[in-house]
């Protein structure tokens, strides 16, 4: 086994994480676009930014936001399925720590889990509200009033997305060294003709 080689498991984990990352980055950028360039209004109406084109037209931005969000959701589901045992173990450890039945986590551990929880909750709310808009429509379409009004769903989608982005940036910063270490090992294995080994599995810094 050559120095710096990685296992097939590590390579596959990295590819899934890369899909999550790419989907999240594009979804975040397009989401920020709509945060500052709201979609309501009409030509000559109350929205002075209506019809403004930045790189792409609004329809293209909307498609990018929708389908890269779908990519992120699918990749996250696969990610959680693969690391479900880790998630359950960490949840049990956290509960035992809070109830005093296990080893208390240090401040760094608690902060790390809190950030992970913020990412997960923000993602879940943004994903659910995003799926709502895929089927309920936007703009002048009739409001289906499913559980909440369209305005409430929009607020949930917007601010859960903001929370998710902030928490994800912090999460990424915390695990930056791990990310660069694994990426440096995985990228060479992606070259044509090179296959991952059955050996070294790089320990994850977290789910």
Where on the chain are the PLM-derived regions?
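Membrane-embedded alpha-helical bundles that constitute the cytochrome b-like, heme-associated redox core
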Residues: 1-207
């Amino acid at each position: 086994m050559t120095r710096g080689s990685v296992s097939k498991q590590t390579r596959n984990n990295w590819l899934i994480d890369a899909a999550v990352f790419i989907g999240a980055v594009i979804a975040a950028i397009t989401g920020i676009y709509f945060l500052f360039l709201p979609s309501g209004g009409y030509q000559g109406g109350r929205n002075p930014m209506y019809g403004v084109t930045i790189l792409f037209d609004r329809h293209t931005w909307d498609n990018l936001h929708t389908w890269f969000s779908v990519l992120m959701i699918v990749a996250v589901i696969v990610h959680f399925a693969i690391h479900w045992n880790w998630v359950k173990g960490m949840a049990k450890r956290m509960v035992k720590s809070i109830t005093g039945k296990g080893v208390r986590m240090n401040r760094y551990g608690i902060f790390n889990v809190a950030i992970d929880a913020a990412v997960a909750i923000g993602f879940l709310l943004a994903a659910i509200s995003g799926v709502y808009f895929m089927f309920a429509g936007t703009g002048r379409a009739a409001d289906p009033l499913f559980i909440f009004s369209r305005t409430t769903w929009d607020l949930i989608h917007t601010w859960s997305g903001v929370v998710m982005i902030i928490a994800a940036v912090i999460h990424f910063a915390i695990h930056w060294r791990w990310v660069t270490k694994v990426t440096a090992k995985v990228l060479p294995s992606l070259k044509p003709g090179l296959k991952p080994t059955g050996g070294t599995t790089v320990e994850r810094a977290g789910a």
